[in-house]
Structure formats: C-alpha cells, structure tokens
Amino acid sequence: MNSKTVVLGTARTPFGRLGGALSAIPATSLGAAALAGAIDRSGVDPAEIEHVILGQVLQAGVGQAPARQASFKAGLAKTTTSETVNKVCASGLLAVVSAARMINDGSNAVVAAGGMESMSGAPYLLKEARTGYRFGDGKLVDAMIADGLWDYYFEMTMASQGAKVARELGITREEQDAYAYQSHQRAVAAYASGEMKEEVLPLHVASKLKGKFVVEKAPQAARARIPALAGGSSGSSMWDHTPAEEFAPNPDAWSPFVTGDVPHVLFERDEAIREDSSLEAMAKLKPIDKDGTITAANAPGVNDGAAALVLADEAWARSNGHTALATILDHATVGWDSPYIALTPAMAAHKLLEKNNLSLSDISVWEINEAFSAVVLTTAKLLGVDSAKMNLNGGAVAMGHPIGASGARIVGTVIHQLRKRGGGYGIAAICSGGGQGDAVLVKVG
C-alpha cells in the first residue's frame, strides 16, 4: 500500500528551564500531557489511537518502556502499542517519521508520535558501584552530558563542534549573538500576538504535589482512561482479564493529572525566553570553550518539555470526518563526520529537495532547530537562504531545547506557520549527535 499521512492535531508543553517550573515532572508525564493535548485537539477518539511512538534521549532511571508509561498516563488503552526511539536531538522528528511510515505502508491508520525530555531529571551515575569498590573514591557521571551532550567518538561537546564549523565558515561571534537576539525578540512577539496558542498547551502545574498537573477539565484522553484496573476479572476469558487488586498499578504512576482544589500555578509560556535580552549583555558572556564563539546566550539552555502530533491515513481521516492540518510528504537523513554536525541540517534539506524535485523557491517556511545560533547560520549559508526567513517565531535558543522533544516541536511549528501563511511547502530540519541530520517535508493545502 502507499497511503498518504496527514496530521490531525498537535500540542506541546511550554518548555521549562533546568530546575524550573517543570523540573519535578517526570518526562513520561510531560509526554502524557502533550499526547493528551494533541489527541484532544485532533478530535480523534482516544480508543482509535493504535500506536504511540515517542522520542527520549535521557532514559536512565526513567523506568521500563517510557513511551508505554506516557501512553498509559495519557489515558490510552492497554491495547494501544508503543515504542521509544533515541536518535539524540532528532528523536522526536524520527518518531513522527516512523509513524508516517507505518501509516504509509498500511500497518496502522492512526498513530500518535512526538518526543519528551526532562533534562532536569537526568541522574548522576556511579558506574563502578555494580561490582563494588575495593577502596578509594568513586566517580559520578552526569547522565545528561554523557548520554545527550557529549560526542562519544571524538570526545568533545556539541558546543565545541558547533564552534568548529562556525570558525571554518567564517561565522563570527557577533553574527551568532545577533541571531540569538533575534530569536528571543521573535519568540516574545509570537507570544504577545497570541500566535502560540495553537501550538502550546498551557499546564496547571501543581505547586505542592510533586510530579502532577492540575486539570480543571481533564483532557479527552485522560477522561477515557481505562476506568478500573483493580477489582478482578471482567469475564471468563483471559482476553477479558482485568488485573486483580494486588496487581493494580500505583495510581500516582498511572496518571499525571489531578483534579480538585489543589494549589497550582499556570505555566503557559516557555520559561527561557528573555524579553530583556540585549546584544550588550550577550557580548559580555565568556564562550563555553576557550577561543570559541558559542556562549550561554547564543546556545539553547537545558530544558524540560514534550511535543506530540496525531497522524492518520488520509482516507481514514476523510471517512471519519476529520480535517487534516497538513500532509507529511517525505523525509531525508544524512550522516557525516560528527565534529561537523552543524553541516547536517543543510545536507538533509538539500537531499530532501532533490528527492522531490523542488527548489529553494518552492519552500515557504523553514524551521531549523537552533542547536546553536551557529547551526542555523551555517544552514542558511550552505543552502543560500536568508537566515531571516528561518524560524519566524524564534527557536530553541529562546524557547528551549528539551532534546528528545525538539524534533517533534519543529514539525508542529512548520505546520502552524504554513497554515498562518496560506499553505505551501515547509521543511523542518535538525542535526543530531554522531554527525547525523534529518529533514521532513510537509505541505499544507
């Protein structure tokens, strides 16, 4: 079969800072909130979601089958299958692409996909403790750096790699700071105009209940949660079996949502956006690497958040009365020497254009993940596209980069940008650790 895949709904959480508003929320609960929001916005009955694919990079200590956890917490049925994918920063985008492939080949009609990350929740590892210490000190390993931000092959940070490419292409510190300033200003303007309401799902974060969201009216998916996983069998067949009380899940693990009169705060905007950013303040910051050009200002922060989309077979969507937001047309992936990771979004986008016989002028919207300002400036330079035409609402430098979620976030952003501008083709592209790049082609109208 060769079905077409359409997107029926998208949602993402606001992104939190390291140790910030979402730091007590497990990644799987963030994923559940995004899933529930996307499903609610799509109008699809939660019971019709056949499969869930979620990207997550920092899985140490999260627990078995993270996507399955998020699926259950979002209220989806035990018959809804799931899988977790890890392609570093491209994880969420790969989840969306994998869902489209399953739909295109006829394996599934409706799949929810996206990504989630709690970088605040990444643990420290004591690797030698398994076999015991004879004597002496032990070494703690930061799982966030080791599993997410460190090139295993060349033993260098992602920031060092971005700075290397910027230096070789002649991209200056001043250009990178100017781009970062633009990202913040665009993000501030997008929220002020109300444009982000279609994209961001506000959260009522319980201020005194660790790891919970307050819902005044539970999202549709949460309301559809299997009503009673305790209390014995509902039938004589094994297939009708409901676990007995002693095997019932912990309610706190089952749903991230709570109701009632609970103290909470409304979290509705990305926490890292700076209205007061200035080029003068940025210029005072020291680079991350000696003699480098990447700083805390022209790189994204360490963030928490999730994003999700509901994808479906076009014919199924039409026959069930659903309106498609966009069509997922194609995907391209490339690999290169990992120190040159900043080249890969341009390489993937170029490959995607060639595959589909499209030119640069055919693309109405570009969303390039701001792994660093240098990555977007590199992409613009290699493709020959004005960087001012990319990331029109700002990007990860301002909004944040929860690494497992960003790939899904930029696909959703491209869709909403295209709809705002009357349709056309859009490309979302992202680099990922190990020297890989991915790009997705979407169409509205």
Listing of model-derived features with the role each one plays in the protein:
Residues 12, 24, 32, 175-230, ...:
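N-terminal extracellular/periplasmic Venus flytrap/periplasmic-binding protein-like
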Residues 85-117, 160, 166-195, 308-315, ...:
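Active-site-proximal alpha-helical scaffold in enzymes
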Residues 1-62, 66-74, 81, 161-173, ...:
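Conserved active-site "lid/cap" helical segment
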Residues 1-25, 167, 277-342, 347, ...:
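Condensing-enzyme catalytic core mediating Claisen C-C bond formation in acyl metabolism
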